[in-house]
Amino acid sequence: MPSSQALNHSIPHALNLLGEVAMRKWISLVSVAALGDSVADSLLRLPLLRAMFCELIGLKVGMIREATELFLLGLLSVMDALLNLPMAVVLQEITVGDDIKKALLGRSSRYRPIFGVVLDYESGTREQLEESCRHCGLHENFLPDLYLQSVRWISDILAEVPVTA
């Protein structure tokens, strides 16, 4: 079997063996470990924080089936900065759904309101945050707890990354 066919077979096989939750955790760990010391700490934490925050907001507003895609949206949200390429170029090189692409490019999509809440919460723009929360049907009083859950999740993930000397 050619290597590309083997890879196409091995990824779904790994997903079946590990399960989605374990695979997501593994991908998060590999991503963090692979970046190493050359990338600022904020660029290590930010995609993980956004990923979990997007997922938790989605779950809170009833987008249970979309949780994995919302996680991916957050994870990919800083790939342009990590790769030093425009987001449009990054998105040409990977296969993701249109809703994720549109949200990352600032266009209207099912996921853009949730991503907007995340960005507005980070930037502290109160009026815009209120509008974003209204748009996705979320009461903003839930955000500090969801954010804290995301931060705790990152701490747990990073605690599992072996320290190399």
Per-region residue spans from a language model:
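Conserved alpha-helical "signature site"
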Residues: 1-165
